[in-house]
């Protein structure tokens, strides 16, 4: 079994800038994705950690984002669906990140500065090399 721990800050991620803005931390699972009418849709769930007012403001701000199709939260737990236009670059990144051979050892942590920490494993080193290539 091969493992990889990386820290990234994705420019297309709708959560990163907001965690930095509201100084909250997300424990995040990207549950699934699908494609429809030239768009990529992402389904995610997670736990929001921080001061109550900041967590609420984070969710209210996120709900205003035009990319967000659905957002529901109860206390700290949330489920979200958001979309973005499909491009070749994003389609390739999605193919790599949603590889069914990847095992997420823990939730992706998006910290108060907007950085994501991923810890993943695979029986094939090449899978992790592809994940690592997403950083560049």
Question: What would you call each of these model-derived segments?
Answer:
Residues 2-134:
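DNA-contacting interfaces and partner/effector-binding or oligomerization modules
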């Amino acid at each position: 079994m091969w493992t990889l721990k990386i820290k990234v800050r994705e420019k297309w991620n709708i959560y990163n800038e907001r965690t930095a803005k509201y100084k909250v931390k997300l424990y995040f699972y990207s549950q699934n994705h699908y494609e429809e009418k030239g768009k990529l849709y992402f389904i995610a769930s997670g736990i929001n950690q921080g001061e109550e007012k900041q967590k609420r403001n984070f969710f209210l701000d996120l709900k205003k984002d035009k990319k967000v199709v659905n957002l529901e939260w109860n206390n700290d737990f949330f489920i979200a669906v958001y979309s973005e236009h499909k491009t070749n670059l994003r389609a390739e990144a999605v193919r790599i990140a949603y590889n069914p051979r990847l095992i997420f050892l823990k939730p992706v942590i998006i910290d108060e500065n907007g950085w994501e920490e991923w810890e993943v494993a695979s029986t094939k080193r090449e899978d992790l090399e592809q994940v690592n290539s997403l950083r560049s």
